[in-house]
């Protein structure tokens, strides 16, 4: 029994492969796996029971296709009959997937049907698949009351439930303390207060959970119940300002270690100012060390005044702290230099310049230059600003002699304004070298367009341009971005001119050259025609030219055989060989399949199979070919064409 899956609003003949017109089919033993992997929708998909014609088991994947089907039955995915048929036949492969699918769509009747047949399942550690419908009380009750079969870890269900009715229901089946702890962390405070009614034993552990989850009403309720706790044992869990305020307001106090822990955990200037107002001593070194990576500074906090208030000393000021200020506020950094003279040993004008360039702060770039900053240290940073004003300001003070050392970075960061500035100011920019970089690195950005325009406007001749274009073309690279500039081409020989004419898209011109220059039997010419994607209106002209070359070389067996191998890249040509020329695939198909193994084109393999090529009958072992050290015939042929070593 085989199946084909369709969309309900499509005719079955609209669901075949667009090119081959074949159908993806699923054997009965694999059908349950499709429900989850393809996320079938009972309202959008239908299931057809079909009789296949030729069955093609793809050697590169688990997919199975057929060239034609006969419809036997059509089933809705909500039709219990099809599941009854399959389960009664003992089909159980991928049953877990069907279960998950039924749960997702809340199909209790299907779950009941599966439960009645009890095929072997394994949902252990897979409770996550229940998350989509875990708030349905009927589904939960169904699973819990039949958990002798489903074997689901009920405690894990808590991770996906926030329904009060369900959680209270689960309290009869799960350890109450685990539920209470879950509720503290995941549900409202009011819900928690409802849950603990009864004989629930509450401890400091529950207070700690309330602190960790920042639940002040829960914390207040537990403390009002008289639950004992030791502040020193929960201090590391206090990471919320409001929680701390509550704990201090009810009479708790902090020792020196606790203050440092709290500052580290909550790390805001608001907290520090609050603690100072309560009379606590602040560790200025600790606070300053936190500025660069974690301290959250309130909007209304004056950094200089804040440092004064915590009694910061010159020696406390670190490079990280100063860099933080430079990144955030240059003016504050200047004020600190004035108020803390010792900061000048940490801050130098080069550090100022670095961050002024990064933030493109022109006044402070000028300030740094006037202070004697070394511009040479920051050539790269200056060039990557892509800011003409900054470039003009800096490069007027210090000219860059080795600008080409930074070209790659300029290209990578798409700094087109920088490049224009350098060209306009007569820096020695090697545009031809930049063009080679664009080709080699396959960069696509506005710089590429600018470089090509400059080369064109300056009438520069690109060395080996024809070779560059042909190499890109035969490696399936984009050449159109080069062709559109109509650069001057220098051909080494007539063959180069023919290939370039094909690449440009002049089919008639290429055909005339082939005849005039006597290249009718050249494989590189044929390969170029096969690879070139002509406009749709010229597609018949392309095929006619290829047929002309084949007819001209009809007595040249080696040429015809090579053309057949190359047809793997042009399906109309392959069909021409198979359907019009009726080439013997039992003799010739193996080389193509060898190439397809590495290329992964499943469609062409199926086409060959439907037209007579049989892997088994040809004694062709897919695994052996895949692991073989011997290069396949097509790969060898292509390499010989690219390297001009073909005959």
UniProtKB/Swiss-Prot annotation:
Presence of keyword Mitochondrion: no
Coiled coil regions in record: none
Highest taxon of the lineage: Viruses
Keyword field contains Repeat: yes
Record keywords, A-Z: ANK repeat, Repeat
Stretches forming ANK repeats: 123-154, 202-231, 233-256, 258-284, 289-319, 348-377, 401-431, 529-558, 588-617
Protein name: Putative ankyrin repeat protein L764
